[in-house]
Amino acid sequence: MSINWILLIIGGLFETGFAVSLGKAQHTSGKEQWWWLAAFAISVSLSMYLLFKAMGGDKAIPVGTAYAVWGAIGAIGTVIAGIILFKEPVTFWRMFFLSTLVISVIGLQIVSSK
């Protein structure tokens, strides 16, 4: 796995961070809300920067693949965080479609490596 893929995965995790930060900010007020909004700003900045870096250099990931994988990692992480942190429901169909995202990310990584 190249450094670009590692950067992309970390960027996707920061995408989860900015989505969770927004969710937490919605459920707080005052000074605590501002801390969550600051976490959002930092997370979104790092996420976008790492996505940008993953698409450059000698081992550049194609933009379409990078964006799809980045978004999927963020979506998967956000669903898992929502279940754990916000007590969102765990249903068969939710887990089924989440697993299709995981399979798609793996497939994109495989075909982009060739």
Regions found by a protein language model. Give the residues of each.
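Polytopic alpha-helical membrane proteins, predominantly small-molecule transporters/carriers
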Residues: 1-114
